[in-house]
Amino acid sequence: MRIQPLIQIAVFDVADWEVDAEFGVFPQGARAKDAVFAPNPPPEPVITPGKRYLFKRSKRSYPDQFWGEVVAYRVGCLLGLQVPPAFAAWNSRTGYCAALIEWFYNDNNEAFVMAGDFLQKIHKDFDRKQGKQHNLLDNMHLLRTFAISKLLEPGWRQWWIDALLFDALIGNTDRHQDNWGFIFRRTEQDAPSRLAPLFDNGTSLGHERFTDRVDRWTEADYDRYVSKGTHQLKWSLSDPVQGHISLLQRALDEWPDTRKVAGARLNFSFDELSDAVADLARLAAVTPLTSERFEFMLRLLACRLELLRALF
């Protein structure tokens, strides 16, 4: 079930990579992004020559936030989930460090449509900026309609359970209506769409906590912090937001057939989890993944992993 991750040897420098003239500075989301094309030959075999990548920087307040995208990719691989490959990178001209994220669809024959575009048709007043109306029941209605009309490949219930499981493990609080969506094939009008890989995973892993302020945290402090984590979406329009674990539990109760696969995804040890990301802390980056940040991420992952296993 696990996916072998693409592992870089060194931090990639994109200073001489071609900037995408069509996309330029990518407008979607809160963090600055540039679209660039990988050179030929590529710096390492894990990079596909000529392919578009997103150079996604951190929020200014949290300069090492980009590491969350890279760690999340590795965690997704351990779970056996489709997450766009993410690498540590920088631009030697600007000095910016960022996550370098592989584009997850082929522009030549595919199109990506954000779920928010469809949800806005269900609720004409849907607030795309705040996303407070984003809820699972509306998502279910949309996906069921697509599936009945043969517009979507089967398996959407398992996809959502897996997404909630992944977000609960990494502590992602930002799976809003534009952070998931559909990939359509342009050349095959009658072909069903598929749900996109789990992209945009950087609002996670305690990125907003400064390591010098958590170095004395007790086990109770970690438990308290983890218990406050919530998903971005709600169960229904009238429900409040729920904690990472409780919303996943509710979805598992709704779709019991998804439980076996979801539980099997957690079949790894803490040592395997640590080993899956340990090499990142050894990369020589201008903004490194420090040992303090690395240990903090691991402690959070360990806490959440224990809570998730208790569900199965």
What residue ranges belong to the model's regions?
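A broad, structural surface signal
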Residues: 70-78, 158-166, 299-306, 310
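Non-catalytic, well-ordered alpha-helical scaffold segments
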Residues: 70, 95-98, 158, 163, ...
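C-terminal catalytic region of ATP-dependent kinase domains
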Residues: 186-312
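Conserved ATP-binding subdomain of kinase catalytic cores across diverse folds
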Residues: 4-127
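Aromatic-acidic/polar surface patches that form glycan- and anion
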Residues: 25, 64-68, 158-159, 290, ...
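Conserved kinase catalytic-core segment
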Residues: 64, 137-210
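ATP-dependent phospho-/nucleotidyl transfer catalytic cores
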Residues: 104-164, 280-282
